[in-house]
Amino acid sequence: MAYTILRFAKQKGGAARSIDAHHERTKEEYASNPDIDKSRIAQNYHLVTPRWSYEQEIKHRIQMAGCRVRRDSVKFVDTLVTVSPEFAKAHEAEMPEYFNRAFDFLKERVGEENIFSAVVHMDEKTPHMHLCFVPLTKDKRLSAKEILGNKKAMIQWQDDFYACMAERWPELERGTPAVETRRKHLTPQWYKKVTAMDTKLEKLEAALSDVNVFNAGKKREEAAALLKQLSLIHI
């Protein structure tokens, strides 16, 4: 099964510098994310290139809007767009179209003028896009709650995003938002581990199905191999 994936992470501003360094690949080493292949960093590309640092981009937009900012205000939203690894591999040539379509969907919802960075990472196992925006309303208020909505609205976001992407790629399936799974939003590192575990569990379920007297030995070997692989995934 191939899933569309859309994740929002609300940020109050303190993480802007570290997120900037990660998304824009300004670090020399990436110990926290060993999946990054430094030899492929040049393959990354922007749909929106930041003019300044993330901190400056955020500060500039808020100042220009002249809006009120509280200590607990969400100053920007870090958005992740990706797709199941098997789909990305099978549709490698179509990945630019995938991210362009996702970008068009998001800019209509959050306001293109509020987006200060949209970068596609091709230097990891699965291509993905990080899109960051300041949640400014049309009447110049800082309100992530109004733009993203409540839990019910987040489910609608997933429905609409899936409909947009599946119109082009009908084989895709809808991702499940955290409000439905009861699972908190995951960091990229944890997400990769959970995805790997989910994939192994699906294969294990398949290996244990349709067991009969003729294939029992082979099925047992497949299950044992998958269980060993699961034990190596440290969550």
Predicted regions and their residues:
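N-terminal nicking endonuclease/strand-transfer module with a His-rich metal-binding environment
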Residues: 1-232
